[in-house]
Protein backbone atom coordinates (compact mmCIF):
# COMPACT_ATOMS: atom_id res chain seq x y z
CA UNK A 1 0.00 0.00 0.00
CA UNK A 2 1.46 3.36 -1.03
CA UNK A 3 2.04 5.99 1.62
CA UNK A 4 1.89 9.76 1.59
CA UNK A 5 5.11 11.76 1.36
CA UNK A 6 4.48 12.96 4.92
CA UNK A 7 4.10 9.43 6.32
CA UNK A 8 7.39 8.41 4.67
CA UNK A 9 9.14 11.59 5.83
CA UNK A 10 8.13 10.91 9.44
CA UNK A 11 10.07 7.59 9.29
CA UNK A 12 13.43 9.33 8.70
CA UNK A 13 12.97 12.90 9.99
CA UNK A 14 11.30 14.44 13.04
CA UNK A 15 8.46 16.55 11.64
CA UNK A 16 7.85 19.87 13.40
CA UNK A 17 4.93 22.29 12.84
CA UNK A 18 5.99 25.88 12.13
CA UNK A 19 2.98 27.76 13.49
CA UNK A 20 1.39 29.36 16.53
CA UNK A 21 -2.07 28.23 15.36
CA UNK A 22 -3.16 25.65 17.95
CA UNK A 23 -6.02 24.33 15.81
CA UNK A 24 -3.63 23.70 12.90
CA UNK A 25 -1.29 21.80 15.25
CA UNK A 26 -4.19 19.64 16.45
CA UNK A 27 -4.89 18.77 12.82
CA UNK A 28 -1.35 17.82 11.71
CA UNK A 29 -0.13 16.29 15.01
CA UNK A 30 3.62 16.97 14.76
CA UNK A 31 6.31 15.79 17.20
CA UNK A 32 7.45 19.35 18.01
CA UNK A 33 6.36 22.92 17.21
CA UNK A 34 8.18 26.20 16.59
CA UNK A 35 6.85 29.71 17.11
CA UNK A 36 8.28 33.17 16.43
CA UNK A 37 6.97 36.75 16.90
CA UNK A 38 5.43 36.79 13.40
CA UNK A 39 3.59 33.50 13.98
CA UNK A 40 2.40 34.55 17.46
CA UNK A 41 1.20 37.88 16.01
CA UNK A 42 -0.76 36.03 13.30
CA UNK A 43 -2.33 33.65 15.83
CA UNK A 44 -3.10 36.47 18.30
CA UNK A 45 -5.16 38.18 15.59
CA UNK A 46 -7.42 35.13 15.12
CA UNK A 47 -10.84 35.23 16.82
CA UNK A 48 -10.30 31.67 18.12
CA UNK A 49 -7.52 32.89 20.41
CA UNK A 50 -9.07 36.14 21.65
CA UNK A 51 -9.66 34.69 25.12
CA UNK A 52 -5.98 33.67 25.50
CA UNK A 53 -4.93 37.18 24.46
CA UNK A 54 -7.42 38.90 26.78
CA UNK A 55 -6.61 36.71 29.78
CA UNK A 56 -2.88 37.26 29.25
CA UNK A 57 -3.33 41.04 29.03
CA UNK A 58 -5.46 41.25 32.15
CA UNK A 59 -3.00 39.04 34.04
CA UNK A 60 -0.05 41.28 32.98
CA UNK A 61 -1.99 44.37 34.09
CA UNK A 62 -2.72 42.72 37.44
CA UNK A 63 1.00 41.88 37.85
CA UNK A 64 2.15 45.44 37.13
CA UNK A 65 -0.74 47.32 38.74
CA UNK A 66 -3.50 49.56 37.35
CA UNK A 67 -1.24 52.59 37.02
CA UNK A 68 1.29 50.82 34.73
CA UNK A 69 1.48 52.33 31.20
CA UNK A 70 -0.16 50.20 28.49
CA UNK A 71 3.09 49.78 26.51
CA UNK A 72 4.84 48.29 29.57
CA UNK A 73 1.88 45.96 30.19
CA UNK A 74 1.92 44.95 26.50
CA UNK A 75 5.64 44.08 26.71
CA UNK A 76 5.08 41.75 29.67
CA UNK A 77 1.93 40.40 28.04
CA UNK A 78 3.90 39.32 24.95
CA UNK A 79 6.28 37.21 27.06
CA UNK A 80 3.30 35.72 28.88
CA UNK A 81 1.43 35.21 25.59
CA UNK A 82 4.32 33.31 23.98
CA UNK A 83 4.33 31.00 27.01
CA UNK A 84 0.50 30.74 27.02
CA UNK A 85 0.55 29.59 23.38
CA UNK A 86 3.48 27.29 24.17
CA UNK A 87 1.57 25.69 27.04
CA UNK A 88 -1.49 25.03 24.85
CA UNK A 89 0.75 23.60 22.11
CA UNK A 90 2.56 21.30 24.58
CA UNK A 91 -0.81 19.89 25.67
CA UNK A 92 -1.19 18.57 22.09
CA UNK A 93 2.31 17.52 21.02
CA UNK A 94 4.55 14.89 22.67
CA UNK A 95 7.80 16.81 22.13
CA UNK A 96 9.12 20.34 22.54
CA UNK A 97 8.05 23.86 21.67
CA UNK A 98 10.45 26.62 20.62
CA UNK A 99 9.81 30.04 22.19
CA UNK A 100 11.79 33.02 20.93
CA UNK A 101 13.53 35.70 22.95
CA UNK A 102 13.00 39.33 21.92
CA UNK A 103 14.82 39.82 18.59
CA UNK A 104 15.72 43.34 19.71
CA UNK A 105 18.17 41.70 22.15
CA UNK A 106 20.02 39.82 19.38
CA UNK A 107 23.31 41.66 19.95
CA UNK A 108 23.14 41.63 23.76
CA UNK A 109 24.39 38.40 25.37
CA UNK A 110 23.46 39.23 28.98
CA UNK A 111 19.96 40.53 28.15
CA UNK A 112 19.29 37.40 26.06
CA UNK A 113 20.32 35.14 28.96
CA UNK A 114 18.14 37.14 31.37
CA UNK A 115 15.06 36.86 29.15
CA UNK A 116 15.66 33.15 28.53
CA UNK A 117 15.68 32.62 32.32
CA UNK A 118 12.39 34.57 32.57
CA UNK A 119 10.75 32.44 29.84
CA UNK A 120 11.85 29.16 31.45
CA UNK A 121 10.62 30.40 34.86
CA UNK A 122 7.20 31.23 33.36
CA UNK A 123 6.94 27.72 31.88
CA UNK A 124 7.99 26.15 35.18
CA UNK A 125 5.26 28.12 37.00
CA UNK A 126 2.82 26.47 34.57
CA UNK A 127 4.20 23.05 35.55
CA UNK A 128 6.24 22.62 32.36
CA UNK A 129 9.85 21.45 32.69
CA UNK A 130 12.72 23.06 30.81
CA UNK A 131 13.32 19.80 28.90
CA UNK A 132 10.16 20.51 26.86
CA UNK A 133 11.19 24.03 25.83
CA UNK A 134 13.76 25.27 23.32
CA UNK A 135 14.79 28.91 23.68
CA UNK A 136 15.00 30.46 20.22
CA UNK A 137 17.86 32.90 19.72
CA UNK A 138 19.14 34.64 16.57
CA UNK A 139 22.50 33.26 15.36
CA UNK A 140 24.56 36.40 15.98
CA UNK A 141 27.93 35.97 17.70
CA UNK A 142 26.37 37.46 20.87
CA UNK A 143 23.34 35.15 20.61
CA UNK A 144 25.58 32.09 20.22
CA UNK A 145 27.54 33.09 23.34
CA UNK A 146 24.26 33.43 25.27
CA UNK A 147 23.19 29.97 24.08
CA UNK A 148 26.55 28.49 25.12
CA UNK A 149 26.00 29.75 28.68
CA UNK A 150 22.34 28.65 28.78
CA UNK A 151 23.24 25.13 27.58
CA UNK A 152 25.74 24.84 30.46
CA UNK A 153 22.80 25.60 32.79
CA UNK A 154 20.68 22.87 31.18
CA UNK A 155 18.51 25.28 29.17
CA UNK A 156 18.27 24.01 25.60
CA UNK A 157 18.48 26.42 22.68
CA UNK A 158 17.33 26.64 19.05
CA UNK A 159 19.60 29.01 17.11
CA UNK A 160 17.53 30.61 14.40
CA UNK A 161 18.03 33.01 11.47
CA UNK A 162 20.97 30.86 10.40
CA UNK A 163 22.18 31.39 6.85
CA UNK A 164 25.93 30.70 6.74
CA UNK A 165 28.42 27.95 7.50
CA UNK A 166 30.25 30.25 9.95
CA UNK A 167 27.06 30.57 12.03
CA UNK A 168 26.45 26.81 11.96
CA UNK A 169 29.99 25.85 12.99
CA UNK A 170 30.06 28.48 15.77
CA UNK A 171 26.78 27.02 17.12
CA UNK A 172 28.12 23.44 17.01
CA UNK A 173 31.34 24.45 18.76
CA UNK A 174 29.25 26.22 21.44
CA UNK A 175 27.35 22.97 22.07
CA UNK A 176 23.86 24.27 21.29
CA UNK A 177 21.05 21.72 21.10
CA UNK A 178 19.63 22.63 17.71
CA UNK A 179 20.06 25.00 14.76
CA UNK A 180 17.45 26.22 12.26
CA UNK A 181 19.05 27.00 8.88
CA UNK A 182 16.55 28.96 6.76
CA UNK A 183 16.10 27.24 3.39
CA UNK A 184 13.48 29.46 1.74
CA UNK A 185 15.00 32.78 2.73
CA UNK A 186 18.32 31.71 1.19
CA UNK A 187 16.45 30.82 -2.02
CA UNK A 188 14.69 34.22 -1.95
CA UNK A 189 18.04 36.05 -1.78
CA UNK A 190 19.60 34.15 -4.68
CA UNK A 191 16.51 34.50 -6.88
CA UNK A 192 16.51 38.25 -6.31
CA UNK A 193 20.29 38.56 -6.71
CA UNK A 194 20.66 36.47 -9.89
CA UNK A 195 17.20 36.72 -11.47
CA UNK A 196 17.28 32.93 -11.86
CA UNK A 197 14.96 30.24 -10.56
CA UNK A 198 16.29 27.21 -8.68
CA UNK A 199 14.61 23.81 -8.35
CA UNK A 200 15.31 20.66 -6.34
CA UNK A 201 18.95 19.94 -5.54
CA UNK A 202 20.01 23.17 -7.31
CA UNK A 203 18.19 25.25 -4.66
CA UNK A 204 20.90 27.19 -2.74
CA UNK A 205 18.92 26.80 0.51
CA UNK A 206 18.81 23.02 0.07
CA UNK A 207 22.55 23.01 -0.70
CA UNK A 208 23.30 25.07 2.42
CA UNK A 209 21.42 22.73 4.78
CA UNK A 210 22.92 19.65 3.10
CA UNK A 211 26.44 21.07 3.56
CA UNK A 212 25.78 21.90 7.24
CA UNK A 213 24.19 18.48 7.95
CA UNK A 214 27.10 16.60 6.36
CA UNK A 215 29.65 18.72 8.25
CA UNK A 216 27.96 18.09 11.63
CA UNK A 217 27.70 14.33 11.04
CA UNK A 218 31.25 14.05 9.68
CA UNK A 219 32.75 15.60 12.81
CA UNK A 220 30.31 14.07 15.33
CA UNK A 221 28.72 17.24 16.72
CA UNK A 222 25.76 16.68 19.05
CA UNK A 223 23.95 19.76 17.66
CA UNK A 224 21.03 18.66 15.49
CA UNK A 225 19.91 20.33 12.26
CA UNK A 226 16.31 21.48 11.73
CA UNK A 227 15.71 22.84 8.22
CA UNK A 228 13.26 25.77 8.33
CA UNK A 229 11.51 28.40 6.19
CA UNK A 230 10.33 26.33 3.23
CA UNK A 231 8.86 27.83 0.07
CA UNK A 232 7.64 24.58 -1.52
CA UNK A 233 7.48 20.81 -0.94
CA UNK A 234 10.34 20.29 -3.42
CA UNK A 235 12.78 21.75 -0.88
CA UNK A 236 11.45 19.41 1.83
CA UNK A 237 11.75 16.34 -0.43
CA UNK A 238 15.41 17.21 -1.12
CA UNK A 239 16.13 17.27 2.64
CA UNK A 240 14.44 13.98 3.58
CA UNK A 241 16.59 12.40 6.29
CA UNK A 242 17.56 15.69 7.96
CA UNK A 243 17.36 15.43 11.78
CA UNK A 244 14.26 17.64 11.92
CA UNK A 245 12.29 19.80 9.48
CA UNK A 246 9.90 22.53 10.67
CA UNK A 247 7.11 22.94 8.15
CA UNK A 248 4.06 25.20 7.83
CA UNK A 249 0.60 23.55 8.14
CA UNK A 250 -0.10 24.32 4.45
CA UNK A 251 2.98 22.43 3.23
CA UNK A 252 2.35 19.60 5.73
CA UNK A 253 -1.11 19.16 4.20
CA UNK A 254 0.38 19.13 0.68
CA UNK A 255 2.86 16.41 1.71
CA UNK A 256 0.06 14.42 3.33
CA UNK A 257 -2.08 14.62 0.17
CA UNK A 258 0.60 13.34 -2.22
CA UNK A 259 1.68 9.73 -2.70
CA UNK A 260 5.06 9.04 -4.32
CA UNK A 261 8.33 7.33 -3.46
CA UNK A 262 10.40 9.42 -1.02
CA UNK A 263 14.10 8.47 -1.05
CA UNK A 264 16.42 9.46 1.80
CA UNK A 265 18.59 12.38 0.66
CA UNK A 266 20.59 13.09 3.83
CA UNK A 267 22.43 10.19 5.46
CA UNK A 268 24.58 10.48 8.60
CA UNK A 269 26.57 7.31 7.84
CA UNK A 270 27.44 8.47 4.32
CA UNK A 271 28.44 11.90 5.67
CA UNK A 272 31.00 10.29 8.00
CA UNK A 273 32.91 8.98 4.98
CA UNK A 274 32.97 12.29 3.10
CA UNK A 275 36.09 14.38 2.44
CA UNK A 276 35.29 17.59 4.34
CA UNK A 277 37.76 20.15 5.65
CA UNK A 278 37.30 21.12 9.30
CA UNK A 279 37.17 24.79 10.23
CA UNK A 280 37.40 26.56 13.60
CA UNK A 281 35.35 29.69 14.14
CA UNK A 282 36.53 32.28 16.65
CA UNK A 283 35.09 35.81 16.73
CA UNK A 284 37.56 37.19 14.17
CA UNK A 285 36.83 34.32 11.76
CA UNK A 286 33.09 34.66 12.34
CA UNK A 287 33.14 38.40 11.62
CA UNK A 288 35.33 37.93 8.52
CA UNK A 289 33.19 35.11 7.06
CA UNK A 290 30.01 37.02 7.86
CA UNK A 291 31.26 40.17 6.11
CA UNK A 292 32.27 38.13 3.05
CA UNK A 293 28.95 36.25 2.83
CA UNK A 294 26.58 38.89 1.42
CA UNK A 295 23.58 36.61 1.59
CA UNK A 296 24.07 35.64 5.27
CA UNK A 297 24.86 39.25 6.19
CA UNK A 298 21.74 40.61 4.44
CA UNK A 299 19.31 37.90 5.59
CA UNK A 300 20.42 37.92 9.25
CA UNK A 301 20.03 41.71 9.42
CA UNK A 302 16.68 41.55 7.60
CA UNK A 303 15.45 38.67 9.78
CA UNK A 304 16.25 40.43 13.05
CA UNK A 305 14.60 43.63 11.77
CA UNK A 306 11.54 41.64 10.62
CA UNK A 307 11.06 39.82 13.92
CA UNK A 308 11.65 43.07 15.85
CA UNK A 309 8.99 44.81 13.74
CA UNK A 310 6.53 41.93 14.25
CA UNK A 311 7.10 42.21 17.99
CA UNK A 312 6.53 45.96 17.96
CA UNK A 313 3.32 45.48 15.94
CA UNK A 314 2.08 42.86 18.39
CA UNK A 315 2.88 45.08 21.37
CA UNK A 316 0.86 47.89 19.74
CA UNK A 317 -2.00 45.47 19.07
CA UNK A 318 -1.88 44.30 22.70
CA UNK A 319 -1.75 47.88 24.05
CA UNK A 320 -4.80 48.78 21.91
CA UNK A 321 -6.69 45.70 23.09
CA UNK A 322 -5.80 46.52 26.71
CA UNK A 323 -7.36 49.97 26.33
CA UNK A 324 -10.52 48.36 24.90
CA UNK A 325 -10.69 45.92 27.82
CA UNK A 326 -10.12 48.71 30.35
CA UNK A 327 -12.98 50.69 28.80
CA UNK A 328 -15.41 47.76 29.04
CA UNK A 329 -17.90 47.98 31.92
CA UNK A 330 -17.30 45.55 34.79
CA UNK A 331 -19.05 42.24 34.12
CA UNK A 332 -19.25 42.87 30.36
CA UNK A 333 -16.89 39.99 29.63
Swiss-Prot record:
Sorted alphabetically, which InterPro entries does this protein's record hold? Answer: Aldolase_TIM, TAL/FSA, Transaldolase_1, Transaldolase_AS
Compartments, record wording = Cytoplasm
Q: What EC number(s) would the UniProt record show?
A: 2.2.1.2
**Active-site residues, Swiss-Prot/TrEMBL:** 136 (schiff-base intermediate with substrate)
Gene3D superfamilies found in the cross-reference section = Aldolase class I
Q: What is its pathway?
A: Carbohydrate degradation; pentose phosphate pathway; D-glyceraldehyde 3-phosphate and beta-D-fructose 6-phosphate from D-ribose 5-phosphate and D-xylulose 5-phosphate (non-oxidative stage): step 2/3
The record's keywords, sorted A to Z, are: Cytoplasm, Pentose shunt, Schiff base, Transferase
Q: Which reaction does it catalyse?
A: D-sedoheptulose 7-phosphate + D-glyceraldehyde 3-phosphate = D-erythrose 4-phosphate + beta-D-fructose 6-phosphate
**What biological process terms from GO does the record include?**
carbohydrate metabolic process; pentose-phosphate shunt
Question: Where mainly found?
Answer: cytoplasm
Q: Which GO terms describe its molecular function?
A: transaldolase activity
User: Would you say which domain of life the source belongs to?
Assistant: Bacteria
Q: Name one GO cellular component term.
A: cytoplasm
* PANTHER family for the chain: TRANSALDOLASE
Q: Which family does it belong to?
A: Belongs to the transaldolase family. Type 1 subfamily.
Its assembly, as annotated, is: Homodimer.
- Name the HAMAP family for this protein: Transaldolase_1 (MF_00492)
Q: What does this protein do?
A: Transaldolase is important for the balance of metabolites in the pentose-phosphate pathway.
**What is the protein name for this chain?**
Transaldolase
Amino acid sequence: MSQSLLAQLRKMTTVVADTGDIQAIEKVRPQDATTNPSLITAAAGMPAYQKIVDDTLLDAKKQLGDSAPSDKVAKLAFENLAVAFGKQILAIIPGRVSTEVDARLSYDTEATIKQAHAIIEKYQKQGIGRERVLIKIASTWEGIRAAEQLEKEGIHCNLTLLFGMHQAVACAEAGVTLISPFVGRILDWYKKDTGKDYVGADDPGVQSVTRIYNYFKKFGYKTVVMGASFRNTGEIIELAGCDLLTISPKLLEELDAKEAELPRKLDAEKAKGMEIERITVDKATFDKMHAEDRMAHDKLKEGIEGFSEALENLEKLLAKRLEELSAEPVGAK
